[in-house]
């Protein structure tokens, strides 16, 4: 079981929560980005993978290497959809879990909003990332990580 982070746009707070959990639970964690990403020196289970520049290269790497039961962190809905379809647990930096039951409607809404923006309609943006988001992320991340670890332990018996 591994943790995958789509690191190009992951907030620092999210990475800190994941780094602490990875160290505490000895879980392999891989940050994937188009540019080097800092990894704590004492985090022996955390590593960074730099993919070549280009649209969706980090996404392709995570989809190719992630396995069912792994946990992924991404704000990229199309990537989340691919990972959910592959059997990964997926969470966004604000603590929203994506599942087979929710991903289709989230992708549909995203596409609708893209169409509105393409037609010149101002749709606004996301609120700035704040303490409530970090707390929601930490709570959902802990729950999903526990679930993923239990699933990995059960399948290895």
From Swiss-Prot:
Family annotation (HAMAP family): UPF0178
Family: Belongs to the UPF0178 family.
Signal peptide: none
Pfam families for the chain: DUF188 (PF02639)
Organism in which the protein naturally occurs: Rhodopirellula baltica (strain DSM 10527 / NCIMB 13988 / SH1)
Taxonomic superkingdom: Bacteria
Matches recorded under NCBIfam families: PRK00124.1
Name assigned to this protein: UPF0178 protein RB974
Disulfide bonds, paired cysteine numbers: none
